[in-house]
Amino acid sequence: MKTATVFVLVALIFMTMTTAWALSNPKEKPGACPKPPPRSFGTCDERCTGDGSCSGNMKCCSNGCGHACKPPVF
């Protein structure tokens, strides 16, 4: 009985986390991220978590260490 309860709780936690992730990271916005200049390292701050966390048409892109919102390249 205890094993079944633990299994159900783990399954519920997994489903909740998966749903929360899917809602917080909508589909990728059009365009590509600009490439960071060679031998450059941006700040290691995570200023975005996905395209959905950037305003307008901005994309969440790597800056060489962390991520920041950047205008897309087409």
Swiss-Prot record:
Disulfide bonds: none annotated. This is WAP four-disulfide core domain protein 18. Could have proteinase inhibiting capacity. Residues 1-24 form the signal peptide. InterPro entries: Elafin-like_sf (IPR036645), WAP_dom (IPR008197), WAP_four-disulfide_core (IPR050514). The gene is WFDC18. One of its GO terms (molecular function) is serine-type endopeptidase inhibitor activity. It holds the Pfam family WAP. Its main location: secreted.
